[in-house]
Design a protein with these regions (language model features):
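Glycine-rich, small/hydroxylated-residue low-complexity segments
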Residues: 1-106
């Protein structure tokens, strides 16, 4: 298994505020734009479960930035050639094959 975790120490609000200032709007508006655009951007990859999971986690995180976690925990060992085959032939199956989850504020 593998896990990538980001713990916010205030940088998210500062980054959103900075991005908003650069675009003559607020950090809150930038957060709303990100929340709206994320599902649209992810839809092109044809991974609806991952799209919904990422969108829900991002919405939760942007509403109250604490932490964001990406975990890959396959139910059983996955041989590397199987991962490569899925990546080349059916990339939309990778999140399920690898047991990918994306969560926020847990």
């Amino acid at each position: 298994s593998a896990q990538l975790r980001f713990e916010d120490a205030g940088i998210t609000k500062r980054a959103l505020d900075y991005a908003g200032k650069e675009r003559n709007t607020s950090g809150e508006q930038i957060a709303q734009i990100l929340k709206a655009m994320t599902p649209l951007y992810l839809a092109q990859y044809n991974m609806p479960e991952l799209q919904n999971m990422v969108s829900a986690a991002l919405n939760t995180y942007l509403d109250n930035p604490q932490n964001l976690t990406v975990t890959a925990q396959p139910p059983k060992s996955v041989p590397f050639p199987m991962i490569m085959g899925a990546a080349m032939g059916a990339p939309n199956t990778l999140p399920g094959l690898l047991g990918v989850t994306v969560t926020a504020n847990d």
